[in-house]
Amino acid sequence: MSSSTDARRQEVLRAIVADYIASQSPVGSKALLERYQLGVSSATIRNDMAVLEAEGLIAQEHASSGRVPTQKGYRQFVDTLHDVKPLSKAERRAMLTFLEGGVDLEDVLRRSVQLLAQVTKQAAVVQLPNLKVSRVKHCEVVALSPVRLLLVLITDNGRVDQRNVELDDVIDPEQTHRLRDILNTALEGKTLTEASVELAALVDDSPADIRPHLLKAATTLIETLVEQPSDRLIMAGTSNLTRVALTEGLPSIIEALEEQVVVLKLLARVPDLGNVSVSIGEENEADELRQTSVVATRYGFGTGSEAAALGGLGVVGPTYMDYSGTISKVSAVARYVSEILAGE
């Protein structure tokens, strides 16, 4: 078979997938001839469709209907995508403006899933950074009153945790300043596990006049560090799944998405920063998600050998999703989140 014949059949497959994504209706040779510039006769298109069907790339749902893509057909379509739909300047500007409105890391990530759900019309998920690899960047101590402190713990990946501390005795501004210095000297640059150990050993060596205050602050900070789960997810847009043809298995799909382990496995399939993973139908390990497709990537810092992924984000939708547009939007949101975290 000539390479030109193979290329033409790929174009026929691409046209069938594109038409079905747009209409969710079986596609016939007449529709392909009318809507796409394939440059061949209806008989040639019918012959190509017969070959594609024999190869398992398309299927006929009913004897009198046109053809629909199979999961194998979607996979070949995705694997041969040469270009994804570029975002317009207005879309890029609107996305970045919305994300930059986040007040801290969690707010930025919450906005990212809301944005992804809105622009892709799919269910969106994002994984908060794994705190096992986080390090303390700074600990701020603010006196809210003479007997009440606000502790603000900031990690190197932008995570911010705030806790109030009720003191047993009055603390003056000079003591507050010293308390801040002691905590930062002990904690800055430490992993969260190391920080907990440092805090536990800190009190005995502290000046007597601030020891009670330091004990209260250290206890609160240790509780904060211990409370943090290693993986957390934020989800948005599950209602979008009710608008697509997933009604038969919708309850089990939503239940699977609410199982964090299932979603974390999906996000873990992305090898590194800058890559987008597409899992189609049966490629998903969870049985409940085998009529869906998952488009996922990672966000983090740096590029190349200096890259450090902090977590994953992506969308879950029907197998007939707009792959080109979805890949572009997932990639863009991850890139903008990474830029915001890097302070660019």
Swiss-Prot record:
Negative regulator of class I heat shock genes (grpE-dnaK-dnaJ and groELS operons). Prevents heat-shock induction of these operons. SUPFAM superfamilies: GAF domain-like (SSF55781), Winged helix' DNA-binding domain (SSF46785). PANTHER family: HEAT-INDUCIBLE TRANSCRIPTION REPRESSOR HRCA (PTHR34824:SF1). One of its GO terms (molecular function) is DNA-binding transcription factor activity. Keywords: Repressor, Stress response, Transcription, Transcription regulation. The lineage of its organism: Bacteria, Bacillati, Actinomycetota, Actinomycetes, Mycobacteriales. GO terms for biological process: negative regulation of DNA-templated transcription. The gene is hrcA. Belongs to the HrcA family. This is Heat-inducible transcription repressor HrcA. InterPro entries: DeoR_HTH, GAF-like_dom_sf, HrcA, HrcA_C, WH-like_DNA-bd_sf, WH_DNA-bd_sf, WHTH_transcript_rep_HrcA_IDD. NCBIfam families: hrcA.
